[in-house]
């Protein structure tokens, strides 16, 4: 990777930046479809300029927080869902790098990308508990709408630089949709 300008105009060497530790959540309904939300684009974030805005819930792991706890916290903060049961935890962490034009800008300019631990859950509740805009607890809305999507469609709905992550996640959890 080559250097890129950060938010202050200084050159940023992506190799010198860490990955942000995060969790990702695949939530399946009883029909085997996956919950996906359409991201609200914030200027300067990693989705700025994207047209493929559908994604599964994800978010950062707080310092000292267990990834499984972070997954349930993020799911609630972004969707309001609490009626879920754990199906599976992916064995490996999956990394992605930001594209060059976002390096040093997105993710507050502090990270080269994310390293994600993925979890699959079954949604056991009533869809009336899903609340995205506004989400519960005074959290900022990240999605403007949501749908249940076929798992195989997910890689083509996400922003291109996260596509390989979604391909790996779908391959890992494909057997759960059957």
From Swiss-Prot:
A motif (Nudix box) lies at residues 59-80. The keyword Nucleotide-binding does not apply. InterPro entries: Nudix_hydrolase, NUDIX_hydrolase-like_dom_sf, NUDIX_hydrolase_CS, NUDIX_hydrolase_dom, RppH. Residues 18-171 form the Nudix hydrolase domain. Its EC number is 3.6.1.-. GO terms for molecular function: bis(5'-adenosyl)-pentaphosphatase activity; guanosine-3',5'-bis(diphosphate) 3'-diphosphatase activity. GO terms for biological process: nucleoside phosphate metabolic process; ribose phosphate metabolic process. Pfam families: NUDIX (PF00293). It comes from the Bacteria. Keywords: Hydrolase. Its cofactor is a divalent metal cation. The keyword Hydrolase applies. Belongs to the Nudix hydrolase family. RppH subfamily. Accelerates the degradation of transcripts by removing pyrophosphate from the 5'-end of triphosphorylated RNA, leading to a more labile monophosphorylated state that can stimulate subsequent ribonuclease cleavage. This is RNA pyrophosphohydrolase. It comes from Brucella abortus (strain 2308).
